[in-house]
Regions:
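Interfacial segments of alpha-helical transmembrane regions
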Residues: 39-49, 97-119
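Extracytosolic (periplasmic/ER-lumenal) interhelical loops and adjacent juxtamembrane/interface segments
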Residues: 129-172
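Short, Lys/Arg-rich, polar N-terminal cytosolic tail immediately upstream
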Residues: 25-39
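Short terminal hydrophobic/aromatic SLiMs and anchors at protein ends
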Residues: 5, 15, 22-23
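C-terminal TM-helix exit segments that contain a strictly Trp-centered aromatic cap at the helix terminus
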Residues: 59-64, 115-130
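Structural signal for the C-terminal ends of transmembrane alpha-helices
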Residues: 90-98, 192-199
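Non-cytosolic membrane-interface motifs at loop->transmembrane helix junctions
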Residues: 69-79, 105, 137
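A hydrophobic membrane-anchoring alpha-helix module
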Residues: 156-201
């Protein structure tokens, strides 16, 4: 009864309390990130990763067709890795995912990057000793590529004819598969970072 009397007797207090609740709610809403802004940020990051993969594949084509460096089976495997990573990033960019979907895409991208890095590590192992050339010619990977006829899908990019053990090109003392390993590690790290960047206010 006293509360009812106070509410009717002192309406200014009731208005002040309502205003306080309103401003408190506005402050909480402002503190929360806009889902649309987060989705835009994630989409831009995935787009950047897709463009990086396109650039790496374009550089591979340059080395092959302008520098006459024929790819080997393990080169093609790594190119397939870049294609897979790029497709995951592209789908993620077009989807404009929420928090859960962002984690899913980043997990898939990390797995694809890890697989590509493993292929690059094995290629570096083959190049470390020319005597390991026999492990490339007629290897299970070469037979799988032949059975799947991967070269017929994108012939300028996925056909191979070169040996695995030669080091015909280097930049800053790193060979092609060593640079490939560096880029796969960077791409994997970027996929790991995307969900955390998306949470940033």
């Amino acid at each position: 009864m006293n509360e009812l009397y106070a509410a009717t007797r002192f309406p200014s207090k009731r208005v002040a309390a309502a205003r306080s609740d309103y401003h408190r709610g506005c402050s909480l809403a402002a503190a929360m990130p806009d889902p649309r802004t987060v989705s835009d940020r994630v989409s831009r990051l995935y787009t950047l990763l897709f463009v990086v993969c396109l650039g790496l594949l374009g550089f591979a084509l340059y080395l092959q067709h302008w520098e006459n460096l024929d790819p080997c089976p393990w080169c093609v495997v790594q190119r397939l890795g870049y294609i897979l990573v790029g497709l995951i990033a592209l789908v993620g960019a077009l989807h404009r995912p929420g928090p859960i979907a962002t984690v899913v895409y980043s997990t898939l991208g990390l797995a694809a990057s890890a697989a590509g890095a493993a292929a690059a590590v094995y290629h570096v192992y083959l190049q470390s000793d020319p005597g390991r050339a026999a492990k490339c010619v007629g290897s299970p990977v070469e037979r799988i590529l032949d059975q799947l006829d991967v070269g017929a899908v994108i012939p300028p990019l996925l056909q191979y004819s070169g040996p695995c053990t030669l080091k015909p090109w280097a930049f800053l003392w790193l060979s092609i598969p060593e640079w490939s390993l560096v880029w796969f590690v960077l791409l994997g790290g970027a996929f790991v970072a995307v969900p955390f960047v998306a949470k940033r206010d």
